[in-house]
Amino acid sequence: MIKVRVPDFSDKKFSDRWRYCVGTGRLGLALQKEYIETLKYVKENIDFKYIRGHGLLCDDVGIYREDVVGDEVKPFYNFTYIDRIFDSFLEIGIRPFVEIGFMPKKLASGTQTVFYWEGNVTPPKDYEKWSDLVKAVLHHFISRYGIEEVLKWPFEIWNEPNLKEFWKDADEKEYFKLYKVTAKAIKEVNENLKVGGPAICGGADYWIEDFLNFCYEENVPVDFVSRHATTSKQGEYTPHLIYQEIMPSEYMLNEFKTVREIIKNSHFPNLPFHITEYNTSYSPQNPVHDTPFNAAYIARILSEGGDYVDSFSYWTFSDVFEERDVPRSQFHGGFGLVALNMIPKPTFYTFKFFNAMGEEMLYRDEHMLVTRRDDGSVALIAWNEVMDKTENPDEDYEVEIPVRFRDVFIKRQLIDEEHGNPWGTWIHMGRPRYPSKEQVNTLREVAKPEIMTSQPVANDGYLNLKFKLGKNAVVLYELTERIDESSTYIGLDDSKINGY
């Protein structure tokens, strides 16, 4: 039995930096109906502020084209699709966190590509044309959306240049050249636009030290530092899936802390630090993303991550995503909070539960967060991620919660292996790759948390709450004041109803 007495007052604040940004598949996917419908659903339930994805300058979005006029090759900038995409984002109420990349093929110095959709990852063959392209894009955004709006958009240069898959030869010197040219082009458009990088993945934090030293020594603009984070080890690959061991959540939080210290010890100690991608695994084919384990595991990251970073962006909001080809089945290990056919995964509800939290942080430990909201109500989240196979994964809790009203209404929402787990039901169905409409409806129905309510009375300003958390459970308790209007019903007597 784990016993906790929550204090009645705290001067600590719970940060909502966890919902600053969310990741997306390549921007061209935003032209699909299901993508936009899913983004609306996620925005309504979780209220992310920004969205970040690859492919702004890739050929499917179509911004960079070339026309041959006599003996001259002239660039042509086509904003038809990006206008549709960014218009949709802003209409939904979410702003772009703009990743500048990858390389348009007509401007590329080589043919190396990444992903099924062939994003070119080579440097520009003409840095002057690249600079002109960046400036043209920024001028267009400002013309269409206004400078006050565009000044709110961060501009991140490239994606994971420390990996050969994402930047030819993982050439640090060449990336710094790209960054310098791009950052100066952005500042030439407007010196108040925010630009940053290097957007590396884990295992290469020396890049951040080198990057900040380079910016200082070369007088290159930098307004924020960005990095990615996952906690999976090398895996066992199959043609359709990958299985990886996931390290404890402390590993990711320590990565956040480490980079924050690097920044503090640099020539730019006060720079904002954004984790622009994070998840358990770096592969969109790892079934862990579909599970209640993922939901329980991510809870601690949401609870504590904001202590160390200015934002951390979950990768991604939807399984409408095509890095390794078009998805081959309903559940396939995709990154998304929401599976194909708009079926919310357990991790979606972890985020939704955190969206119910208040600002006053009354209590926090490695498996629980208790907050008070502006109206005096209290919200508690607890989780029980089970890292290893065990015969007795359950945890019993007894929590004394301070409440500022005697009559209490409790709403409890629970996800675990048996509740809010459409992946489990899909397995029961026989893992249909392309489920029927009836099967999709069933999966949507079982994706919802279990909800229970009660009406206890608080004594001496405290309520004693007892509960059990099973394997990979995440629970949300909301304690609000109960307003009883029963006396307004003339002749009310429930005992006259048969069986009551």
Swiss-Prot record:
Induction: By xylan and xylose.
Keywords (A to Z) from UniProt: Carbohydrate metabolism, Glycosidase, Hydrolase, Polysaccharide degradation, Xylan degradation
Thermal dependence of catalysis: Optimum temperature is 70 degrees Celsius. Loses activity at 85 degrees Celsius.
Active site (record annotation): 160 (proton donor), 277 (nucleophile)
InterPro entries assigned: GH39_as (IPR049165), GH39_cat (IPR049166), Glyco_hydro_39 (IPR000514), Glycoside_hydrolase_SF (IPR017853), Glycosyl_Hydrolase_39 (IPR051923)
Keyword Hydrolase: yes
Entry EC no(s): 3.2.1.37
Catalytic activity, as annotated: Hydrolysis of (1->4)-beta-D-xylans, to remove successive D-xylose residues from the non-reducing termini
Pfam families hit by this protein: Glyco_hydro_39 (PF01229)
Pathway assignment: Glycan degradation; xylan degradation
One example GO MF annotation: xylan 1,4-beta-xylosidase activity
Similarity comment: family membership: Belongs to the glycosyl hydrolase 39 family.
Protein's UniProt name: Beta-xylosidase
